[in-house]
């Protein structure tokens, strides 16, 4: 009875203790559930789809025609293709190894004679495409391929740059190339990267002989990708840079979990250098020197790429050049991507900046002819800016920022106040016609404000800063919800946004603009990776520019493409704003890699189409047109200012 009375007396205390224990157990169970979900990152393959536990991403294209009509069961994950002069049996085996998925593909010659195989590929239809920015940020991946032999890998990252990502590493055999399938103007155009396939080396199998390719799929968090490769017995290849001047010594590290093998190579000649070790490699480029290469390109433009016929309505314009025809491209077939305006304004911007740093009377005279052509032939009196003298194509917003940038730089070169006003007038025309929400490439924030201030155009300077802030406010508000323009989502919409926001922050010191840029950085960084190649290291994914600006008009990955340097500009300004010098080093890698678009005789290529084959046709080539690639050198000058 005393116990009962005692219990009753302490009932409130006991109840309180039990409630506290319950709450602690509930908290513990929640923490345990969270921890288990964080650990449960196993990779699996079911119903023609790869899944990562706890992640909703469909990492692969649907191969039943429901996502894209042209992506059918032929392209299912793991299906192989090849050309052979005999019968080959391919056996596929999958199993779980802890959290990883291990796949083995065995090619067996069961015939009585030897069989030669070539053009071997295994379809890996990663879900890398651009329906719209919102879908991209939640349900699509950027696929970074490195066909590096025994050290080959794939890093597939959420396009928003956050969360759990998918990795693939070769553990037996070799991947030496990749193909892209189902590209075309009627198959997604610029918004569909294609069906990717990983390619093995050509081989000959004797009777009874087999070849095994094995890879391991695993999850990672992005910044631990290399660590996860090493943890699983793989090799990471790394150099401090991938473009070297002749006479320099390259240092390449081949890193595994046990040790690092360092190989040094004296770069004695220009051109490509392959540094190999035990089936893995790095691709380096030798050049005369960075500045010498730029000097040669500048001279080639002056000597070969300006229209100097006074009878031609394009007199003074800088134009495309056909390296195969060894001639100025007059564009008689009317392709808008070859017009003398548009992206070709980059030649004028480059020469103006170069002439500021290296005064040259001949160059300045050429630039004054070009400025006259733009103002009198490309533009209308109200600064409406066309793409060509014909003025028949659409009114393109991108043109305005480029032309304004050119005019502002012309003022800084010559001191002629009219050029500063022309730059201002061009941007006012842009805002009148396209509003504040247009995502231009190269809003000339720093050059424009500097030119107007030096010219004493205070009202115009203040108005332009107001305009820039109004645009930046929209960018901050939109965040990753980018509108569709010429491509539904792309590197050259997010990179210019970061670059622009950083420059507006530098002009105003208002933190909201830097914070806006910071929020975009994970998605921007997810567009490029660190493959050990001068063409791919810190180069953003682009896969349509060989079609739109090239002679062969081939869709497919372009590594490098000069607009990847917009990311270098963004990183450069972000490093200045934050003090994080790692972004400056990455910016330098990007602009160095783009020097591969320029040759020692001063010629250039608009695009290097990187896959081995596209739609079964041989690719991996430098396009014959020198078109719009000279922007890369303007960015080089910016990053190395």
Give the location of each predicted region.
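Bacterial N-terminal signal peptides that target proteins for export
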Residues: 17-26
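Sec-dependent N-terminal signal peptides
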Residues: 25-34
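Beta-strand-rich N-terminal accessory domains
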Residues: 39-186, 195, 203, 207-209, ...
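Terminal, non-catalytic domain-edge segments
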Residues: 42, 224-242, 466, 470, ...
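Low-complexity, Pro/Ser/Thr- and charge-rich linker/hinge segments at domain boundaries
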Residues: 130-134, 225-247, 281-319
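Catalytic cores of secreted or luminal carbohydrate-active enzymes
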Residues: 191-236
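Extended acidic/polar, glycine-enriched regions
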Residues: 253-296
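Catalytic cores of extracellular degradative/oxidative enzymes
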Residues: 293-565, 590
């Amino acid at each position: 009875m005393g116990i009962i009375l005692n219990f009753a007396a302490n009932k409130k205390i006991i109840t309180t203790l039990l409630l506290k224990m319950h709450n602690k157990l509930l908290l513990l169970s929640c923490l345990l559930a969270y921890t288990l979900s964080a650990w449960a990152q196993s990779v699996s393959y079911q119903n023609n789809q790869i899944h990562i536990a706890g992640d909703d991403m469909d990492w692969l294209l649907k191969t039943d025609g429901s996502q894209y009509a042209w992506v059918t069961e032929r392209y299912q994950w793991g299906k192989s293709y090849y050309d052979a002069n005999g019968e080959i049996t391919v056996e596929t085996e999958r199993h779980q190894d802890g959290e990883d998925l291990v796949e083995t593909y065995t090619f067996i010659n069961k015939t009585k004679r030897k069989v030669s195989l070539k053009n071997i590929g295994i379809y890996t239809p990663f879900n890398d495409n651009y329906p719209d920015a919102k879908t991209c940020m939640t349900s699509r991946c950027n696929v970074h391929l490195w066909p590096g032999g025994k050290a080959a890998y794939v890093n597939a990252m959420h396009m928003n740059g956050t969360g759990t990502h998918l990795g693939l590493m070769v553990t037996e055999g070799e991947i030496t190339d990749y193909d892209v399938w189902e590209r075309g103007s009627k198959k997604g155009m610029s918004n569909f990267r294609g069906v990717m396939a990983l390619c093995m080396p050509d081989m000959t199998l004797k009777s009874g002989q087999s070849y095994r390719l094995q890879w391991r799929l695993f999850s990672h968090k992005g910044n631990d990708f290399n660590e996860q490769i090493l943890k699983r017995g793989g090799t990471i290849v790394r150099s401090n840079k991938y473009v070297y001047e002749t006479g320099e010594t390259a240092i390449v590290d081949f890193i595994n979990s046990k040790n690092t093998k360092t190989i040094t190579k004296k770069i004695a000649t220009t051109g490509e250098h392959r540094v190999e070790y035990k089936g893995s490699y790095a691709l380096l480029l030798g050049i005369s020197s960075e500045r010498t290469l730029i000097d040669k390109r500048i001279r080639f433009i002056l000597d070969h790429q300006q229209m100097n016929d006074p009878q031609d309505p394009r007199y003074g314009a800088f134009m495309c050049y056909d390296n195969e025809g060894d001639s100025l491209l007059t564009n008689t077939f009317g392709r808008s991507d070859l017009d003398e305006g548009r992206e070709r304004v980059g030649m004028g911007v480059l020469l103006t900046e170069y002439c500021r740093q290296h005064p040259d009377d001949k160059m300045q005279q050429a630039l004054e002819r070009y400025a006259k052509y733009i103002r009198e032939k490309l533009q209308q009196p109200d600064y409406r800016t066309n793409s060509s003298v014909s003025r028949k194509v659409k009114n393109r917003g991108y043109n305005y920022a480029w032309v304004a940038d050119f005019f502002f730089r012309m003022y800084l070169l010559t001191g002629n106040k009219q050029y500063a006003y022309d730059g201002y007038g061009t941007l006012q025309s842009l805002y009148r016609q396209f509003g504040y929400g247009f995502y231009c490439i190269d809003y000339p924030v720093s050059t424009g404000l500097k030119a107007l201030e030096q010219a004493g155009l205070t009202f115009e300077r203040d108005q332009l800063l107001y305009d820039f802030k109004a645009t930046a406010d929209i960018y901050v508000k939109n965040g990753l919800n980018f509108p569709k323009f010429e491509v539904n989502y792309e590197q050259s919409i997010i990179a210019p946004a970061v670059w622009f926001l950083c420059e507006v922050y530098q002009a105003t010191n208002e933190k909201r603009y830097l914070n806006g840029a910071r929020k975009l950085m994970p998605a921007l960084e997810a567009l490029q990776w660190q493959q050990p190649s001068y063409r791919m290291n810190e180069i953003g994914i682009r896969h349509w520019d060989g079609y739109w600006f090239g002679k062969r008009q081939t869709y497919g990955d372009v590594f490098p493409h000069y607009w990847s340097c917009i990311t270098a500009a963004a990183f450069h300004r972000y490093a200045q704003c934050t003090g994080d010098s790692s972004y400056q080093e990455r910016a330098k890698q990007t602009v160095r890699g783009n020097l591969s678009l320029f040759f020692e005789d001063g010629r250039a290529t608009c695009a290097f189409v990187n896959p081995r084959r596209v739609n079964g046709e041989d690719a991996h080539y430098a396009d014959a047109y020198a078109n719009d690639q000279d922007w890369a050198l303007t960015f080089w000058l910016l990053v190395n200012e």
